[in-house]
Regions:
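Gly/Pro-enriched, hydrophobic low-complexity segments
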Residues: 19, 154-261, 265-267
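C-terminal motif of bacterial Sec signal peptides marking the signal peptidase cleavage site
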Residues: 14-16
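Sec-dependent N-terminal signal peptides
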Residues: 5-12
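Edge/loop elements at the starts and ends of beta-strands within beta-rich repeat scaffolds
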Residues: 48-56, 68-71, 78-80, 99, ...
């Protein structure tokens, strides 16, 4: 089930644009300035802008490192802004998984074990070791936009040689089902406000989520990162690397139905 989770998440939650250049943890770290930016309203307004496209189709190659052999996956991702994210995955010319996310939740199936899931967003939250992902946060994560809850009270903005660093000055508290989780958050942005790196630390168990974005390109008024890398650090470390090869704004059909004889899998 964990392999199914990694496959589904990597396709449905982490693709954005096109061409290749690897994203690595050794990317230059911005040198933080000591003085906070006092007039930060323009910055917060810019990084929370909503996407304006109607739909985008993305072709991607996905490599997963999680201790098990998973071949390179070819993914087609289709996003209707604010409504749904659909994906289809193949490996070695064989269809291996398909899924769809909407504001109501996530549905997906995989053909190797003939299993499927039908869940709210607790599935992706469990996989990412967080608890604040809903549909809009998921779409923002896919597109390299700010996907964590932010406000100018709990964050400090500094400017540096590479752009900006937004750091939590107070622990970020997320309350879900009467359970409160606290995080520390640090986000790096380029000088033109493109997201470069996000690091979240769960203070209750020391789980960590890191997301890297690189090689941004503007296409018809929309900015997209060409490469994405995600690292999930818990009892073990999983890494997902995305090479996006093509995108366009055409509409496509997004069929989804679970084949006969597939077994529903409990969320773990």
């Amino acid at each position: 089930m964990k392999n199914l989770g990694i496959i589904i998440f990597s396709a449905i939650a982490l693709s954005s644009c096109h061409t290749q250049k690897n994203v690595t943890e050794s990317s230059p770290t911005p040198i933080s300035a000591t003085e906070p930016v006092k007039s930060n309203s323009a910055f917060f307004s810019k990084i929370t802008e909503k996407s304006t496209f109607e739909q985008v189709k993305i072709n991607s190659k996905i490599n997963i490192e999680n201790g098990s052999f998973i071949p390179t996956l070819n993914a087609t991702i289709y996003i209707e802004n604010g409504q749904k994210t659909w994906m289809n995955l193949t490996a070695l010319f064989i269809n291996v998984a398909r899924g769809i996310a909407t504001p109501e939740g996530v549905k997906a199936y995989e053909s190797y074990n003939k299993t499927y899931i039908d869940s709210d967003f607790s599935y992706l939250n469990n996989l990412l070791k967080v608890d604040f992902i809903d549909y809009q946060a998921l779409q923002n994560l896919i597109l390299g936009k700010t996907f964590i809850p932010i406000n100018d009270r709990d964050f400090e903005l500094t400017q540096n040689a590479q752009g900006y660093t937004l750091s939590s000055k107070n622990n970020i508290k997320i309350n879900v089902d009467s359970k409160t989780t606290e995080y520390t958050v640090k986000s790096d942005y380029s000088s033109d406000f493109n997201l470069a790196k996000v690091t979240l630390n769960n203070l209750s168990n020391q789980d960590q989520l890191e997301v890297y974005y690189n090689n941004w390109e503007n296409f018809e008024g929309n900015s997209f990162p060409k490469n994405v890398k995600i690292i999930i650090k818990a009892k073990k470390t999983d890494q997902i690397l995305i090479e996006n090869t093509k995108f366009d704004f055409s509409k496509i059909a997004t069929p989804y139905s679970v084949p006969n004889n597939y077994k529903k899998t409990a969320i773990k």
